[in-house]
Amino acid sequence: MRLIEDRDSGLSTAEIPAGSMTSTKRRMNTTERKRQILDRAIQFFAQHGMDGQLRNLTKELGVTHTLLYHYFPTKDALIQEVYKEVFESRWKPEWEALLDDQTLSPEEKFNAFYLDYTNTVLTYDFVRILIFSGLSDHSISDRFFELLRSRLLPRLIRETRKYCNRSTTSKPTQRELEFLMGLHGGIFYIG
């Protein structure tokens, strides 16, 4: 017989004969199970891409298809939750406020923004999921690039124009947008 420590409570449980130990799984509540599936799906899509088979994900999780579909009715629903978790949850409204701050010079804004931006987005799961999406269905990459185009790039173009002593009143040109998308592509390449 040996003494076993309950990992959840840290308390010692009754003595159990050594040969009668069986693996028991603690039943998770709904929130914990959904979080477990989502966290593992993020790792799974970062490793296998967006075309990874859900049957392999369920096998890795040790759950049935039925349970997976209880929380995420379709693969697309799961991918949308992955997008929200990996991309939307990391988006910082402070970036927009920083770029709009009239008290800072363009150089100060660029330095502060790109330092924080790269530290936030250049993670294994962010970069790999973005690249895998770009290589397959574009569902995530298109949404992320639209977010960049609508909320960041116009501000970055405005600050670049200020730095170059050019007019900041006209809409960004296609050429300017492409230039900044190329810059962001370079950042991901370095990452």
Which residues does each PLM region occupy?
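N-terminal intrinsically disordered/low-complexity leader segments
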Residues: 1-32, 43, 64
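Hydrophobic alpha-helical segments that form the core
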Residues: 4, 169-191
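Amphipathic, non-transmembrane alpha-helical scaffold segments
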Residues: 30, 34, 83, 110, ...
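Helix-turn-helix
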Residues: 36, 40, 44-85
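Short acidic/histidine-centered micro-motifs embedded in hydrophobic/aromatic stretches
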Residues: 57, 85, 129-133, 147, ...
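Amphipathic alpha-helical linker/stalk segments
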Residues: 82-112
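Helical hydrophobic small-molecule/effector-binding pocket
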Residues: 84, 107-132, 187-189
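Amphipathic alpha-helical packing segments from all-alpha helical-bundle domains
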Residues: 92, 119, 129-131, 139-166, ...
